[in-house]
Amino acid sequence: MAKSSVKEREKKREQLIKRYEKKRKEIKQQIIEASTLKQKWQAYEKLSQLPKDSSPVRQRRRCWLTGRSRGVYRYFGLCRHMVRKMAHEGLLAGVTKSSW
């Protein structure tokens, strides 16, 4: 189980990403459309002024049940431990134990 402070930090990052998403896209478009090197550098400077945590790269995929960051299945949004546990209990629709 992840610490609650780590979970809260991830939520804060998610909010920052949503808040600065439009601004970040506009600045990146300016970088692409810049005709001179000076304009490009100015746009890069604007981009670097934004908060670090507003970049989507800094967000980590976490299990919504436990907060675990490693071994998370995208399809379920759960870590491997919870997928196994819930599958055995029959809580995941369409998941069956394989046998051949």
UniProtKB/Swiss-Prot annotation:
Disulfide bonds: none
Pfam families recorded: Ribosomal_S14 (PF00253)
Similarity comment: family membership: Belongs to the universal ribosomal protein uS14 family.
The keyword Oxidoreductase is assigned to this record: no
GO molecular function: rRNA binding; structural constituent of ribosome
Localization annotation: Plastid, Chloroplast
PROSITE patterns: RIBOSOMAL_S14
Subunit note: Part of the 30S ribosomal subunit.
Species whose genome carries this gene: Cyanidioschyzon merolae (strain NIES-3377 / 10D)
GO biological process, one term: translation
SUPFAM superfamilies: Glucocorticoid receptor-like (DNA-binding domain) (SSF57716)
InterPro entries: Ribosomal_uS14 (IPR001209), Ribosomal_uS14_bac/plastid (IPR023036), Ribosomal_uS14_CS (IPR018271)
Main location, first listed in the record: plastid
Name of the featured protein: Small ribosomal subunit protein uS14c
Keyword entries, A-Z: Chloroplast, Plastid, Ribonucleoprotein, Ribosomal protein, RNA-binding, rRNA-binding
